[in-house]
Structures are given as structure tokens and as C-alpha cells.
Amino acid sequence: YPDVAITLPNICRAMDAAAAAGIPVVVVQHLMPSGAPVFARGSDTAALHPEIARRPHDLLVEKTMASALTGTSLGGWLRERGIDTLVVVGYMTHNCDDSTVRQAHHEGWKVELLHDATGSLPYRNAAGAATAEEIHRVFTVVMHSNFAAVASTEAWLAALAKGEALPVDNVFLSNQRAITA
């Protein structure tokens, strides 16, 4: 959730708009050793989606951990270029996106996440069960309370056209609005 029929076109729109605006585009690929249940190097689950693969990008990052900043050259590459803001799109909201958002925030970058250009999957395990929509909603609400400015692709495109950053929120106000609603 949201459906890939919504998220994939939004991911592509964001990539295209960033490239047109001269904003560096970084593609991140999660790769695991052969034999892994998902993302095994050379497998279909590790391949970039053709729509992503065909788009121009400034850097391709191969990672083995959830965060795109852990064990990769991405942080140094961003610092060398004086990049102060990361716009996060792609999958999965609750795993790679959340991990990257939090690490980037902790390391001092401003972070923006496009909620309709990211997505989650449903889970069931010993801790319980949650739908993809529940997971996506909870993670984006929490990210927006402290770690990232979370907005739609349309809102980001409008802010980009105006040369503005997305508005950020904070933990206190997010909580106060919830308890007074």
C-alpha cells in the first residue's frame, strides 16, 4: 500500500522532475547473497524495475543493509557535493525508507519523503499482524512527527517549482493535535 499503479508513476515523476531541476538522482539497489529469499544478486527480486533502470541517475548505490547510508559511499558522495536535503521515494516505507530517513536525520540532513511514491507490505508474525495500509500510515505519521517532511508527490512538485522546502512538523505538535482531536 499504496498500490504500485500509484507509487511507480509517482516515483518516476519525482525522478524526472529532480533531473530536470538539476537535482542529483541517486538510485539505490538492495542486494543480498545468492540464495537469499529476496534481493539475491542476479535474481528477479533484486533487479531494478525497468522504469527505474531506464531513467538517468547520477549515482547507483548497491546496499546490503536497510539504510542506504550504512556501509555505502552515499554519505560521502552527498557531503562532497554539499547536498543538504534527501528526498526519499521507493520501497519499502517501513524498512529501507524508514531506516534511511532516520539515519539521514541523525547525521544532519534534511529529509523529505513522498508518501505516495513509497509503499509497504502486510506482515504477520509472532508479534501480531498489520495490513500494508496500517504499516504505511503509522510509519509516515511517525516520520513526519520528527524525522522527515512527509508529503504527496504533487505537494513536492509544487514546492520544487517554487524553490521551497516541504513544511516539517514536530513531536510535540503532532501529539497535541492527537490528544485534542
Residue ranges and their predicted role:
Residues 9-16, 20-21, 38-181:
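Active-site-adjacent betaalpha module
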Residues 1-5, 128:
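Acidic/histidine-rich helix-loop elements
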Residues 1, 34-36:
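Glycine-rich, proline-tolerant flexible connector loops at the mouths of alpha/beta enzymes
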